């Protein structure tokens, strides 16, 4: 007999946790749509030569390739005959949602309206080394605004407002969107003589590690043989990236002070101007100033970011790390089209976020179900009545489960409690003879009678009240 088990790097949830995960997905989707983003889905696998526009490297080593049994047999036969392998398998599982988006926009460019505002919430796959908190299959929840030839910096501010709306409704604790601009960093490095090119990109990647590895690590790396930057210059870099703002006015003041002290090179001036405009628009969009700040160490390790960059963290749980990140890029689909398609976007890695929240004790004792009511069956002769009651509840929009076999009432209550069903409807001989049914509220441990024809309307009121209770408890995301 084969032992049932899931592959390493997979998060599989029991129903109660799956409901909580699904509700997080629903909140994210709802807020994306409120800001006018349109849904798309792309295939779980893409053509290998399309997905892997840059051959080799870490990305290709983590890609899962897809091969049919027929193709495998043909490859094996060819190998037996001494033939060379025909190259990579034809298909590969997507490793993020950005590359499929680039292919999608390039392929459908003439059918889309620009700026194209898209959201996508799907699983992606990476051959990560199996270890705690690292996943091979995980959900990403992305938004991007794609322009044609140009895209206003105003969208960068709107994306920050989307981040705020999502995490405010998720209710998982206070959070802060940390904001920076790659042009500002590049301009500052240029003022120190760290010229644009591979060296500057490498320095940016090291600076981005400062919150994880610490200033001493970054200092030793930049002064070391690989970089050879003078200690005095490294000290200025570390002092610069240590800057943080406290409040909206302080953020603007820091930009002004930076402009005066360093001198506005063309690149630095662009970065300051873009950040200043984003800050002003974020205020107009109603994002509270406690929810964002400038953090000059945020660079994002991916080299295609060219302007605004974001990282979001939980204020009281910084050990969780970034829970949402992204930024602006100049050309999304340069490998697939000659059109210039600048954009800005962010991604929420929901699988990892959910796992970390659970590990940190921020999701506790979820006792809810998608089933809103259960109709108990105590007597076989009352099955028709029970089915009719359930049918009427469903017509009223109430998710209703029926016990199809008669059991003792106590056992049916136990089942409902274990399943997280709050309301149990009892329709026994005594109740039906009086034209009523009994409703047991398992949370409040109260039972009351209600006229049979008023059951649906009464339960709708009770469910609305229960929903209000859940909101006051951050709907089951109970903070430690």
UniProtKB/Swiss-Prot annotation:
Localization of this protein: Cytoplasm
EC number(s) per entry: 6.1.1.21
Enzyme class name: ligase
Transmembrane annotation, as ranges: none
A Pfam family the protein falls into: HGTP_anticodon
Keywords from the UniProt entry: Aminoacyl-tRNA synthetase, ATP-binding, Cytoplasm, Ligase, Nucleotide-binding, Protein biosynthesis
Keyword ATP-binding: yes
Paired cysteines (S-S): none
CC terms in the record's Gene Ontology section: cytoplasm
MF terms (GO), sorted A to Z: ATP binding; histidine-tRNA ligase activity
CDD domains: HisRS-like_core, HisRS_anticodon
GO biological process assignments: histidyl-tRNA aminoacylation
Catalytic activity from the UniProt record: tRNA(His) + L-histidine + ATP = L-histidyl-tRNA(His) + AMP + diphosphate + H(+)
Cytoplasm is among the record's keywords: yes
Database matches in InterPro entries: aa-tRNA-synth_II (IPR006195), aa-tRNA-synth_II/BPL/LPL (IPR045864), Anticodon-bd (IPR004154), Anticodon-bd_dom_sf (IPR036621), His-tRNA-ligase (IPR015807), HisRS-like_core (IPR041715), HisRS/HisZ (IPR004516), HisRS_anticodon (IPR033656)
Major localization listed first in the record, in broad terms: cytoplasm
Subunit structure comment from the entry: Homodimer.
Similarity comment text for this entry: Belongs to the class-II aminoacyl-tRNA synthetase family.
Descriptive protein name: Histidine--tRNA ligase
Species name: Xanthomonas oryzae pv. oryzae (strain MAFF 311018)
Gene this protein is translated from: hisS
């Amino acid at each position: 007999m084969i032992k049932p088990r899931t592959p390493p790097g997979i998060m599989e949830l029991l129903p109660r946790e799956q409901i909580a995960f699904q509700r997080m997905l629903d909140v994210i989707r709802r807020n994306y749509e409120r800001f006018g983003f349109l849904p798309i889905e792309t295939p779980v696998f893409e053509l290998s030569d399309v997905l892997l526009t840059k051959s080799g490297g870490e990305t290709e080593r983590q890609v899962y390739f897809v091969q049919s049994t027929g193709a495998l047999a043909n490859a094996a036969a060819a190998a037996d005959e001494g033939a060379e392998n025909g190259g990579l398998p034809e298909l590969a599982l997507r490793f993020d949602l950005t590359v499929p988006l680039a292919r999608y926009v390039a392929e459908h460019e003439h059918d889309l309206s620009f700026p194209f505002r898209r959201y996508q919430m799907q699983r992606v796959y990476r051959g990560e080394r199996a270890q705690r908190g690292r996943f091979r299959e995980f959900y990403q929840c992305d938004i991007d605004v794609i322009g044609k030839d140009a895209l206003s910096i105003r969208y960068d501010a709107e994306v920050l407002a989307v981040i705020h709306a999502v995490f405010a409704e998720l209710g998982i604790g206070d959070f802060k969107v940390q904001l920076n601009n790659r042009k500002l960093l590049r301009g500052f490095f240029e003022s120190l003589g760290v010229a644009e090119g591979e060296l500057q990109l490498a320095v940016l990647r090291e600076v981005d590690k400062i919150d994880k590895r610490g200033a001493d690590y970054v200092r030793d790396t930049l002064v070391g043989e690989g970089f050879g930057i003078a200690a005095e210059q490294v000290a200025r870099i570390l002092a610069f990236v240590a800057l943080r703002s406290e409040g909206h006015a302080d953020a603007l003041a820091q930009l002004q002070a930076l402009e005066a002290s360093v001198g506005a090179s063309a690149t630095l001036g662009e970065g300051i101007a873009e950040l200043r405009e984003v800050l002003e628009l974020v205020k107009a969009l109603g994002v509270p100033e406690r929810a964002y700040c400038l953090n000059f160490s945020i660079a994002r390790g991916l080299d295609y970011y060219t302007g605004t960059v974001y990282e979001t963290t939980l204020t009281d749980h910084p050990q969780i790390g970034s829970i949402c990140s992204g930024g602006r890029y100049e050309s999304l689909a340069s490998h697939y089209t000659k059109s210039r398609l600048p954009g800005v976007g962010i991604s929420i890695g929901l699988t990892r976020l959910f796992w970390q929240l659970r590990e940190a004790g921020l999701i506790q004792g979820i006792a809810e179900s998608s089933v809103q009511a259960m109709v108990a069956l105590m007597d076989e002769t009352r099955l028709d009545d029970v089915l009719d009651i359930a049918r009427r509840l469903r017509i009223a929009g109430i998710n209703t489960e029926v016990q199809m076999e008669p059991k003792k009432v106590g056992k049916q209550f136990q089942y409902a409690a274990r399943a997280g069903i709050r309301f149990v409807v009892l329709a026994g001989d005594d109740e039906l003879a009086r034209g009523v049914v009994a409703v047991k509220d398992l949370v409040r441990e109260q039972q009351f009678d209600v006229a049979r024809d008023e059951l649906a309307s009464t339960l709708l009121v009770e469910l609305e009240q229960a929903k209000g209770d859940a909101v006051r408890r951050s709907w089951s995301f109970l903070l430690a």
